[in-house]
Amino acid sequence: MAIININEVMIHLLPGQIIAGLDLGTKTIGIAVSDRGLIFSNPRSVLQRQKFTVDAQTLIKIFDHENVGVIIIGLPLNMNGSSGPRAQATRTFVRNMEAYTEIPFVFWDERLSTIAAERSLLEMDVSRAKRATRIDSAAAAFILQGALNRIHNLHHIEG
């Protein structure tokens, strides 16, 4: 497994593969996947965190089932752009995943993604109880959509 830059995503995808997005929290992991055209992100389940090995095995099953070729993972930087404990935990998580998968990861600045996801759910008039269960997958979809938009822009500039 490698850590790649956003501009390298397309060379790592095989035909038919999609991109996954992850929002890593202390208690849950939000999951989203792209469509086959790599245009739209779609929220999936929220994984309740357990031991790392259990989380890793569950994620790998999801990635295999969805035919994921690249994973975008939110990197929770501080507002000033510096790395704090949560960003370090995310980097450690990715390093630990090396034992479980060859799928490359891309770190994506996730500042304000949870706030944006919550606003989106509020605008859709989702109840407080449902928002609590959907916020992490909505944040993962928001992170993934930002990356998909960037990939699309890069492809149009280069292509």
Swiss-Prot record:
Record EC number: 3.1.-.-
SMART domains with a match to the protein in the record: YqgFc
Entry keywords, A to Z: Cytoplasm, Hydrolase, Nuclease, Ribosome biogenesis
Family matches, as Pfam families: RuvX (PF03652)
Location in the cell: Cytoplasm
Any single biological process term in GO: rRNA 5'-end processing
GO cellular component: cytosol
The keyword Cytoplasm is annotated on this UniProt entry: yes
Molecular function as annotated in GO: nuclease activity
SUPFAM superfamilies membership: Ribonuclease H-like (SSF53098)
Family: Belongs to the YqgF nuclease family.
HAMAP family: Nuclease_YqgF
Role: Could be a nuclease involved in processing of the 5'-end of pre-16S rRNA.
Protein name in the entry: Putative pre-16S rRNA nuclease
Organism: Bartonella henselae (strain ATCC 49882 / DSM 28221 / CCUG 30454 / Houston 1)
